[in-house]
């Protein structure tokens, strides 16, 4: 893995888990608005690191834990996970011994997919991600609701370093067809599972609610997948800071009543 940080180590730490097909620096626009108050840690999965070999989800978590220990991070103010980053983040949450203040899932990819289906998906995912590199971001609109120039570099960098073997290994132990983990109730009360009302991932919301009924489930009315994070990183960062500091969602006009 590769790690980038923003802010002073003396400040409360915020750990980001990134979406599929992008590097960890994709959270940079948000981190820049938090760095005055927080120590932001942006790992890039081994899958998108040149010359590195993806071993397993457990190994990814081990690398994150080792990095946090090396940075003398003994607690996390917040964990933020976008899209498929939710899969790795959930595994991290069930294993880490670090105290965590709040967790925010952005359009979490909580699919439970059979092994055979995941195996068949791999070549299509590989071509989709590599095409973003080959076309310099030109194919982004075919796989995402937007093709903003501001986010293309993260896809291009990820596609450049991606190998088929690493992606196959990642998909083999991600989005597994297992019961969704139920986290401790005390932790659930500090978790936010956000979905846009028009995004495809909205379909996972009910299953997550059944597993973690004490969590918070804000719906961003009229928003697509990760739209608030992409289009308004400052507003998104301010929302995260509000949650961390006030233990509740700010009053945003687009949150479904």
Feature names for model-found ranges:
Residues 94-95, 100-131:
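Flexible "cap/lid" loop of the alpha/beta hydrolase fold
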Residues 212-226:
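Catalytic histidine neighborhood in serine/cysteine hydrolases
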């Amino acid at each position: 893995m590769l790690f980038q940080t923003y802010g002073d180590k003396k400040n409360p730490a915020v750990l980001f888990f990134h979406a599929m097909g992008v590097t960890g620096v994709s959270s940079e626009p948000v981190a820049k608005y938090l760095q005055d108050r927080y120590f932001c840690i942006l790992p890039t999965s081994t899958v998108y690191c040149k010359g590195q070999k993806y071993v397993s989800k457990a190994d990814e978590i081990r690398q994150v834990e080792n990095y946090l220990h090396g940075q003398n991070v003994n607690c996390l103010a917040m964990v933020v996970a976008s899209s498929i980053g939710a899969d790795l983040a959930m595994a991290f949450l069930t294993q880490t011994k670090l105290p965590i203040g709040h967790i925010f899932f952005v359009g979490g990819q909580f699919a439970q997919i059979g092994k055979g289906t995941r195996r068949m998906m791999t070549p299509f995912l590989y071509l989709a991600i590599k095409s973003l590199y080959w076309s310099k971001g030109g194919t982004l609109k075919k796989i995402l609701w937007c093709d903003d120039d501001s986010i293309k570099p993260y896809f291009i960098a990820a596609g450049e370093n991606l190998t088929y073997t690493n992606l196959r290994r990642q998909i083999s132990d991600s989005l597994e067809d297992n019961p969704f983990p139920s986290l401790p109730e005390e932790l659930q009360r500090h978790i936010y599972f956000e979905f846009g009302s028009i995004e495809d991932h909205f379909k996972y919301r009910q299953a997550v609610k059944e597993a973690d009924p004490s969590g918070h489930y804000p719906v961003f009315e009229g928003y697509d997948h990760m739209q608030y994070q992409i289009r308004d990183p400052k507003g998104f960062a301010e929302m995260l800071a509000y949650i961390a500091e006030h233990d509740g969602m700010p009053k945003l006009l687009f949150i479904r009543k």
